[in-house]
């Protein structure tokens, strides 16, 4: 999955969770700092891939598949951020920015190993 798709799913999920309604393409464009037409194109692509439901003038919602992927991305972000703060001593803001970069490159296998490492050594930090 591309970094761009992951960013869209993450932003859509967080918006819907916070606002309890579909996100409009103009709102998502503003959040991602891109043109609404680019969001519309990606919404159509995400719909074809089965991640979102997209209805013009109503907005974008996540399918079960989209929710599952978004939660995995957010879990990855959270795990990396905790590691960076608790194990490497980064401040929250820097850790969040770095986690956003790293979450796209980290495989599921490495994420699981990182979780095991953190659990094993959490009392030694």
Curated annotation (Swiss-Prot):
Q: Which SMART domains match?
A: HTH_DTXR
Instruction: List the GO molecular function terms.
Output: DNA binding; DNA-binding transcription factor activity; protein dimerization activity; transition metal ion binding
What's the domain of life for this entry?
A: Archaea
Q: Which Pfam families match?
A: Fe_dep_repr_C, Fe_dep_repress
Keyword Ion transport assigned:
no
PROSITE patterns xref list = HTH_DTXR
Q: Which UniProt keywords apply?
A: DNA-binding, Transcription, Transcription regulation
**Ranges of residues in domain HTH dtxR-type:** 1-63
Annotated InterPro entries? DtxR_MntR_Metal-Reg, Fe_dep_repressor, Fe_dep_repressor_sf, HTH_DTXR, Iron_dep_repressor, WH-like_DNA-bd_sf, WH_DNA-bd_sf
What family does this belong to? Belongs to the DtxR/MntR family.
Q: Which PANTHER family match?
A: IRON (METAL) DEPENDENT REPRESSOR, DTXR FAMILY, IRON-DEPENDENT TRANSCRIPTIONAL REGULATOR
**Name under which the protein is recorded:** Uncharacterized HTH-type transcriptional regulator MJ0568
Organism of provenance: Methanocaldococcus jannaschii (strain ATCC 43067 / DSM 2661 / JAL-1 / JCM 10045 / NBRC 100440) (Methanococcus jannaschii)
Q: What is the lineage of its organism?
A: Archaea, Methanobacteriati, Methanobacteriota, Methanomada group, Methanococci
């Amino acid at each position: 999955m591309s970094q761009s798709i992951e960013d869209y799913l993450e932003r859509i999920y967080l918006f819907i969770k916070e606002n309890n309604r579909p996100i409009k393409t103009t709102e998502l464009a503003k959040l991602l700092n891109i043109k609404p037409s680019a969001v519309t194109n990606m919404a159509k692509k995400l719909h074809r891939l089965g991640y979102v439901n997209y209805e013009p003038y109503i907005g974008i919602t996540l399918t079960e598949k989209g929710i599952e992927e978004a939660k995995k991305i957010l879990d990855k972000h959270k795990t990396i951020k905790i590691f960076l703060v608790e194990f490497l001593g980064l401040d929250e803001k820097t850790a969040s920015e770095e986690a956003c970069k790293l979450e796209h490159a980290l495989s599921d296998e490495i994420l699981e190993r990182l979780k095991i490492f953190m659990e094993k050594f959490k009392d030694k930090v």
